[in-house]
Amino acid sequence: MQYAKISGTGSYLPANRVSNDDLAQKVDTSDEWITARTGIKFRHIAAENEKTSDLAAEAARRALDAAGLDSGEIDLIIVATATPDMQFPSTATIVQQKLGITNGCPAFDVQAVCAGFMYALTTANAYIKSGMAKNALVIGAETFSRIVDWNDRTTCVLFGDGAGAVVLSAADKPGIIHSKLKADGNYLKLLNVPGQIACGKVSGSPYISMDGPGVFKFAVKMLSKIADDVIEEAGYTAAQIDWIVPHQANRRIIESTAKHLGLSMDKVVLTVQDHGNTSAASIPLALDTGIRSGQIKRGQNLLLEGIGGGFAWGAVLLQY
């Protein structure tokens, strides 16, 4: 049997960097209020002419460079996004075109919001383990600034745009050690964008609707449990985890998971202060940041975990 390992990572952030003080000039908020509740200081916002596929393609190019691969060697593309360029075709096929990949490899999107990268990575791992792919491009990319109500201070301060990518390649021994995905649609009202496109118009609100306390309570509980489950099912202990690479939504949620596992924040790759919540992009963005900064080194054990609307959540234990 062949296994899958990460052979390269890349990320991209739009040039426009927006501070908490910038937002305080537009809505009734402050740097102190945002930082105390979320840990967020900055977020990046895509330019008007930048689409999700543009962010994704640039992150992918950087991941390919890191892996030492030509785009033509990719035989699977999966893009995790809740903010696609258009209703169809998939953002993955648009990225395929922008990268000049003409080998006919499968390309499709996965939508699990902030857990999307976990779903995409797990799917790509299964493709490689089955022998259906050798080099998969797995991307998380979002332009959440376009589904945020910039007059709603409870949500507009939280989100940012960006993209992260990994190249997952066939290997003789496991890089992806174990993964677990979960979902529960009974909580869909806590976090959603209710608007629908039909008959030439948008029916319902096109903006994010969120019950912050409800999301926080569920996230803390389920992320702790799935972290425990993935580690135990793999035959590992929390002490063997070198780095947690979490979904970067809220510093307090991240701290809660680390505390539950008995790990200090020194073992957490933290980027929420610089990126805000970039949904499906946040984990691969943090992963690439940790690798390029020299924090994460080859041979180390990483726990990736995240949760998004639905709810959908997941965790992946891997050796980098």
Swiss-Prot record:
Domain of life: Bacteria
Biological process, per Gene Ontology: fatty acid biosynthetic process
Stretches for region ACP-binding: 248-252
Main location: cytoplasm
UniProt catalytic activity: malonyl-[ACP] + acetyl-CoA + H(+) = 3-oxobutanoyl-[ACP] + CO2 + CoA
Compartment(s) where it occurs, according to its Swiss-Prot or TrEMBL record: Cytoplasm
Signal peptide: none
List of catalytic residues: 114, 247, 277
Keywords associated with the record: Acyltransferase, Cytoplasm, Fatty acid biosynthesis, Fatty acid metabolism, Lipid biosynthesis, Lipid metabolism, Multifunctional enzyme, Transferase
Pathway field: Lipid metabolism; fatty acid biosynthesis
GO annotations of cellular component type: cytoplasm
Enzyme Commission number(s) from the entry: 2.3.1.180
Molecular function as annotated in GO: 3-oxoacyl-[acyl-carrier-protein] synthase activity; beta-ketoacyl-acyl-carrier-protein synthase III activity
Function: Catalyzes the condensation reaction of fatty acid synthesis by the addition to an acyl acceptor of two carbons from malonyl-ACP. Catalyzes the first condensation reaction which initiates fatty acid synthesis and may therefore play a role in governing the total rate of fatty acid production. Possesses both acetoacetyl-ACP synthase and acetyl transacylase activities. Its substrate specificity determines the biosynthesis of branched-chain and/or straight-chain of fatty acids.
Protein family (similarity comment): Belongs to the thiolase-like superfamily. FabH family.
Domains as described in the record: The last Arg residue of the ACP-binding site is essential for the weak association between ACP/AcpP and FabH.
Subunit structure: Homodimer.
Protein name stated in the entry: Beta-ketoacyl-[acyl-carrier-protein] synthase III
Lineage of producing organism: Bacteria, Pseudomonadati, Pseudomonadota, Betaproteobacteria, Neisseriales
Gene: fabH
